[in-house]
Amino acid sequence: MRATEPPTQSVGAYAAVHGPVEAADRIRAGCAPPAVLAEVAQPEPDLRDDLAALEAGHARLLTPEDDDWPNAAAHDLAASGTGAPLGLWVCGDPQLGVLTAGPVAVVGSLAASPYGEYVAAELGQGVADRDIAIANGAGFGVEAHALRGALSTSGRGRCLVVLACGIDVGYPADHGPLLREITDSGGVLVTEYPLGTKPRRTRGYARQRLVAALSEATVIVEAGRRSPALAVARTASRLGRRVYAVPGPVTSATSAVDRTTERHADQAYTWLISSR
């Protein structure tokens, strides 16, 4: 995980065939296929800080051999050619209940309108009231309001946040208290990026595929045509997950839709009304 930049389709497939130890030995020796070597950074990374953090209990490293590994999500990502994670750094509930209880991803615009913020919070609370977890990347706007809506349900709300950085980085910085409240309330923070990894745009897009894969359904509350949230919808659709789009004002740029979200808008309206 230290030597690669997700998504790593070739390295993941190679490790699945040979096992991680033998795969690493072959990569070190330079005898792995060119596609695998192209996904590996040089020189070999220093793992001492990672091992110290694991020993101290600051985080948990989940691997495909663990009972808590999200097998369905990893399998679907690998089968679709999207790239399954090699492992997951986790902070929060050690039982990872939210990973196995079919979360609903609620995502959307960072610059949400008051309408979008209200609907996101209502969805978060309504889903949490049914003992279903909310999943997203804890971004500003729609995502943060959905998480806060879930947390407002008398401690019942559980959240799964997929980070585009190391588990110890705390990004967005303004959401430090929110992330701590999530882990204190039985939720989890998950990332495929090692400790200390800084966020950047490409990692944000790579993260979206995990949000989609770990969720049973995705709801787009508001999103412009270039919104990163639409990457979640497209991946979810590609993986065969349900995708919904909340109808919004036709005059609003954050209620723009593409073909992926447009065909699901009526379903989202029906789902939204029935969940109230």
Model-predicted regions and their roles:
Residues 1-76, 261:
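Short, small/acidic-rich helices and loops at N termini and domain boundaries
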